[in-house]
């Protein structure tokens, strides 16, 4: 007979085997649905630059999260637009702001849905940058404690996972330390490379 040491046909013998060893699959349960939370009530306004996506008030976000879960989506990521902005972006860690309120409300209404929260300052600062700025220079190390405050506030609100989207060096390690120190050792950190495929 033939001297065939490599016989890939073995891995194609039936559908179950092929499913088991296939390289890549994508299912609705692999997706995380983005929710863009805004202040106010009864708001569901389409985002011009993201057709099919909406700015949502907290109550509307809860409804969309439930719909997504009912369709098989197992996670949402919360992005926010605050009621106020300042130089530090302090509304990003304010527990009364839309992101933290949406996290709480979604967790209460759809308890089995994974809630991921975006960690950044750009939406919350008057400069629109993800870091503190002094004389046109990003203050990397001074920004890290602020990002930590954001992540801890999101964990306190009930986020299962935080996803830093800023560009500060050392942010993941700093956030991990802050979450652990605050007692949120089971809150995960997700890389942005996993979000945008």
Q: Model features per residue range: what roles?
A:
Residues 1-38, 42-43:
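N-terminal amphipathic alpha-helix/helix-capping segment at the start of soluble metabolic enzymes
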Residues 35, 61, 118, 154, ...:
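Conserved, mostly hydrophobic/aromatic
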Residues 44-60, 131-145:
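Active-site mouth loops of central-metabolism enzymes
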Residues 31-34, 76-78, 115-117, 162-164, ...:
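Hydrophobic faces of well-ordered beta-strands that scaffold small-molecule active sites
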Residues 45-53, 74-98, 164-172:
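Glycine-rich, proline-tolerant flexible connector loops at the mouths of alpha/beta enzymes
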Residues 28-31, 72-74, 110-113, 158-160, ...:
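Short, well-ordered coil/turn segments that N-cap beta-strands
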Residues 195-197:
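Conserved small/polar residues in nucleotide/adenosyl-binding loops
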Residues 89-117, 171-191:
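Alpha-helix-loop-beta-strand connector modules within alpha/beta enzyme cores
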């Amino acid at each position: 007979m033939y001297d065939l040491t490599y016989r890939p046909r073995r891995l194609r013998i039936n559908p179950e085997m092929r499913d088991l060893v296939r390289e890549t699959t994508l299912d609705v349960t692999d997706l995380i649905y983005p929710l863009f939370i805004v202040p106010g009530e009864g708001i569901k306004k389409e985002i011009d630059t993201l057709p099919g996506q909406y700015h949502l008030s907290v109550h509307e976000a809860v409804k969309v999260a439930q719909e997504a879960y009912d369709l098989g989506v197992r996670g949402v990521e919360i992005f926010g637009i605050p009621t106020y902005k300042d130089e530090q972006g302090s509304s990003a860690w304010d527990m009364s702001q839309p992101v933290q309120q949406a996290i709480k409300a979604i967790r209460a209404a759809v308890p089995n849905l994974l809630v991921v929260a975006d960690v950044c300052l750009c939406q919350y600062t008057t400069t629109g940058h993800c870091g503190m700025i002094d004389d046109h220079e990003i203050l990397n190390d001074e920004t890290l404690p602020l990002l930590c405050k954001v992540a801890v506030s999101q964990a306190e609100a009930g986020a299962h996972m935080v996803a830093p989207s800023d560009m500060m060096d050392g942010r993941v390690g700093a956030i991990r330390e802050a979450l652990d120190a605050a007692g949120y050792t089971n809150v995960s950190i997700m890389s942005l490379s996993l979000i945008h495929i």
